């Protein structure tokens, strides 16, 4: 099913995807009738990230644009939706959806251009890593504000999750600039395995 060097790794992939997809769905149904705007935004973000994970897992069976550009765009929207949810926890302000849409379209345009120029594994990887590290850092700081206001242990877990995402993508960007090549998550080498496990654990925590 998955392009992995061993069936055990395929099983790990399947297990991680099941958790990423089913846990938010289970929480949604358990909280049926108690969804406010903030929780709806958060669950929408979780659904977008689950979509990213599915496209990533099946990247070798999908067209490049769908697997990488669309998957990365869903990740950008994941950060925007979760940011909107946390912002609603802190203050009653209007979410700048128009700006989010424009920024996402700009991201897709740049990412598609780099892919078309066959630069996805160099400049494309660097561009994605920098953007994701920055977005995760913004969400980490915002989540820390929510955690301090409500003294929530769950928010502390989310702070760790966004912090992990930010650090991992920053390291990946650094390795792309100063290393011989970037870290491709499905290379199944030392760095790629560490990155993949950390991303899975952080994503599961968010669920």
Regions found by a protein language model. Name each.
Residues 20-39, 53-193, 200:
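Juxtamembrane segments at transmembrane-helix boundaries
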Residues 197-207:
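Signal-transducing coiled-coil linker helices
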């Amino acid at each position: 099913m998955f392009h992995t060097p061993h069936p055990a790794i395929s099983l790990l992939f399947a297990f991680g995807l099941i958790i990423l997809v089913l846990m938010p769905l289970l929480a949604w149904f358990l909280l049926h009738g108690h969804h406010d705007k903030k929780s709806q935004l958060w669950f929408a973000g979780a659904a977008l990230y689950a979509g990213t994970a599915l496209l990533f897992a099946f990247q070798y069976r999908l067209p490049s644009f769908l697997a990488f550009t669309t998957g990365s765009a869903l990740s950008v929207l994941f950060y925007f939706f979760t940011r909107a949810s946390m912002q609603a926890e802190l203050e009653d302000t209007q979410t700048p959806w128009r700006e989010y849409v424009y920024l996402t379209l700009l991201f897709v345009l740049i990412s598609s251009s780099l892919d078309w120029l066959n630069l996805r594994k160099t400049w494309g990887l660097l561009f994605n890593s920098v953007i994701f590290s920055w977005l995760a850092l913004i969400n980490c700081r915002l989540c820390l504000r929510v955690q301090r206001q409500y003294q929530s242990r769950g928010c502390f877990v989310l702070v760790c999750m966004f912090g992990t995402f930010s650090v991992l993508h920053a390291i990946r960007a650094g390795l792309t600039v100063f290393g011989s090549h970037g870290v491709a998550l499905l290379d199944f080498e030392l760095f790629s395995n560490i990155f993949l496990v950390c991303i899975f654990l952080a994503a599961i925590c968010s669920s």
